[in-house]
């Protein structure tokens, strides 16, 4: 029951394109992004500090850095256009800013897929108090 409540809380914060990111992760990895990466390590989920705990957490660190470089639109709210065939994602948009958001999400989804074997349950709902190290630059 507690897990269902936690998942409901995580879903409340999912707006705009973040649901697109969830769907993209699902298409590329076959996993729910919210369930597997909504609160993982030091960087997956809301916020981020310290050092990435493993390659899966590093995917989120790099994704955060990618979002930090986006100018002119809001990576968490603006919608983008993409298509998928099998597990391949193609970002297609006339707007360069929203295309950039899509490319950030695509890179993260592929990173999750390529690093699924590094995922460790001990980092699921990892306490942020364990993320005390000085963060590395993007």
From Swiss-Prot:
Cystine crosslinks: 42-131, 44-60, 59-111, 65-138, 66-104, 73-97, 91-102
Signal peptide: 1-16
Cited PROSITE patterns: PA2_ASP, PA2_HIS
Catalytic residues identified in the record: 63, 105
Expression sites (tissue/organ): Expressed by the venom gland.
An example Gene Ontology CC term for this record: extracellular region
Co-factor binding comment: Binds 1 Ca(2+) ion per subunit.
Binding site for Ca(2+): 43, 45, 47, 64
GO biological process: arachidonate secretion; lipid catabolic process; negative regulation of T cell proliferation; phospholipid metabolic process
Keywords, alphabetical: Calcium, Disulfide bond, Hydrolase, Lipid degradation, Lipid metabolism, Metal-binding, Secreted, Signal
Catalytic activity: a 1,2-diacyl-sn-glycero-3-phosphocholine + H2O = a 1-acyl-sn-glycero-3-phosphocholine + a fatty acid + H(+)
GO molecular function, one term: phospholipid binding
Enzyme class: hydrolase
Cofactor: Ca(2+)
Entry's localization field: Secreted
The EC number(s) this enzyme carries: 3.1.1.4
Family: Belongs to the phospholipase A2 family. Group II subfamily. D49 sub-subfamily.
The protein's role, per its UniProt record: Snake venom phospholipase A2 (PLA2) that has high lipolytic activity. PLA2 catalyzes the calcium-dependent hydrolysis of the 2-acyl groups in 3-sn-phosphoglycerides.
PANTHER family for the chain: PHOSPHOLIPASE A2 FAMILY MEMBER, PHOSPHOLIPASE A2, MEMBRANE ASSOCIATED
Subunit structure: Homodimer.
Protein name: Acidic phospholipase A2 6
Organism: Craspedocephalus gramineus
């Amino acid at each position: 029951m507690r897990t269902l409540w936690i998942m409901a809380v995580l879903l409340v914060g999912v707006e705009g394109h973040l649901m697109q990111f969830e769907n993209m992760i699902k298409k590329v990895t076959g996993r729910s992004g919210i369930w597997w990466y909504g609160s993982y390590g030091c960087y997956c989920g809301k916020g981020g500090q310290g050092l990435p705990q493993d390659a899966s957490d590093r995917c989120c660190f790099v994704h955060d850095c990618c979002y930090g470089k986006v100018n002119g639109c809001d990576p968490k709210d603006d919608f983008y256009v993409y298509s998928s065939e099998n597990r391949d994602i193609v970002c297609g948009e006339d707007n360069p800013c929203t295309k950039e958001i899509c490319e950030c999400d695509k890179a993260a989804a592929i990173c999750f897929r390529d690093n699924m074997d590094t995922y460790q349950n001990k980092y699921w709902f990892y306490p942020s108090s364990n993320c005390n190290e000085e963060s590395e630059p993007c």
